[in-house]
Structures are given as structure tokens and as C-alpha cells.
Amino acid sequence: MTCLCPQQQYIATFRRGYYSIRPIDLPRAVKFKPRKSHRTESIPSSAKQGRMYEDYCDFTEENPNIPCTELDTVIGEVGGKVIMTIHFVNSDFMAGLFLDNKTAAETASEIGQLKQKLASHGFVFGDIIPLLLTDNGGEFSCVSAFENNTDGEQETKLFFCEPAAAYEKPHTEKNHTMFRDIVPQDQSFDSFTQETVNLISPMSMR
């Protein structure tokens, strides 16, 4: 009898014991570890209201002199440390923040620390980054961490690109392609430090 089930469905039902044979009965099957499931965070629909790419276009048309900064995340090994890239479009300069993981809590924490560090040197985050454009990654779902200062007052406008529309923020995408010339896809960042990121970021803009 021909099995008409998709491959993934067949494997799943096999592992659940729906067939007369078990993984232990297959010499090759026991060599492979089950794949880990990595749940990803998502951005609530309420957070996207008034912050979609169409809204961004309207905002920049009304405020053409406000410089934009593009945000994105470079992933190393899945589940490991990541790099959040910050590209200043007008000056064509990219910096990076080294994060322990790709979660909204970690991203919000690092942005908060950056704001405090800037304030300690007499700088205001909103003056340097008044406008942000990022993708739909769940790590950017804590909107207030990016938009508000320590007093809870808005200092920055954050907007999201449309899903699967990397071309809407082309500068970071171009830099990430060059970044991969230095650090190949799927290479772990766990041995990196912030100093490593500081060295790589300018190199990936050559």
C-alpha cells in the first residue's frame, strides 16, 4: 500500500508509536536526535496599529528631515546569541549590540541599558535615533522600550515593515549579506563579545 502522507506527518506519527515498528527497530533512526522546537515570539496586532510600513511612508513624507535608523537581528546558531544591528541611513554607518538571545525581554533590556549609557554621557537616545524601522521579528515587540524614555515619554517613532518584505529596509539587508562574508550562516556567536561585534560591524560595510 502506498503511503500518501507528507513526509513530516509520517515521521511525526512514526515517533508517536502509531505503527507496529519503533525507532529502536531501525538502525539509522536511533542515530538521530529529535529536532528541537524553537518557539518564536510575535508582535501583537495592537502594537502594529499605526506603525506599519504604510504609516512609516506617511510619516516620512510629512517629516522628510527626520533621519531614519534601520534595525534588524543577525542570528548565529539557532537558540544561541544574536547581534542586533543598528544602521544609521543618512550617515551610512552600522553598529551592533550583542544579545544573549533573540527575545523581546533581552532586546528591551539592552536598549534600556544603551539609553542609560547615552544619558550618562549627556546624550539623548531620541535625539540620535528619532525614527526606527524594523521587521516583524518578535524581539521588537516591546514597543515602549524603543519609543519611550526613562520617564515614559515618547522620544522615538517605531515602525514595522510588512511581513517578508526585506526590501523595505535595504540598507541592513545589504550589510548583512556582507556580514555573512565574515561570519558564515549558522556559525555560533556564543564565543563572541561586544568587542567582537564592534570590530565586525565596520568591516561588513566595506
Protein language model annotation of sequence segments:
Residues 2-61:
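Basic, flexible linker segments flanking DNA-binding modules
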Residues 1, 9, 72, 92, ...:
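Short, conserved catalytic/metal-binding motifs centered on acidic residues
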Residues 61, 72-74, 79-95, 111:
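Short conserved beta-strand segments at catalytic cores or DNA/RNA-binding microdomains
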